[in-house]
Amino acid sequence: MKSQAGLLLLIAVPAMASASALAAPREDLLAGYAAQAKQDDPGFAGFSAARGEAFHRRSFGRGKVDTPACTSCHADDPRAAGKTPAGKIIDPVALSASPSRYADPAKVRKWFGRNCKEVLGRACTAQEKGDWLSFMLSQ
């Protein structure tokens, strides 16, 4: 009995450490976006997954013609796979469907940089990034 408990502990501790290691970069990203959002707007009161969801589904029409909204490539349901205009399959953007997503801050910055310009025709604000990321982390 003790050996089974010990074995479970040996398995559970690294798994929890791994999950915590993946969460840290996401928390750091949100903290950085929050600091920037507060600098941009002293009235900033925090991120909202509801605003992030509205942002994800909104059609902007100011970027590329074939990508007027996040949902142009990423599915309306963030837990489902998406598809680029060229037909390439994109992994789901919801954390629950892609657990390792958003663990690499450089990739997150790269994709926000590219996708915001293509959809909005400009860089996303820190609040937009934090709201959208909060929505994806809640899914």
Question: Model segments located where?
Answer:
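Electrostatic cytochrome c docking/interface patches
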Residues: 25-63
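N-terminal signal peptide c-region/cleavage motif recognized by signal peptidases
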Residues: 12, 18-20
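Short cysteine/histidine-rich zinc-coordinating motifs and their immediately flanking basic loops
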Residues: 82-89
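C-terminal capping alpha-helices of c-type cytochrome domains
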Residues: 109-139
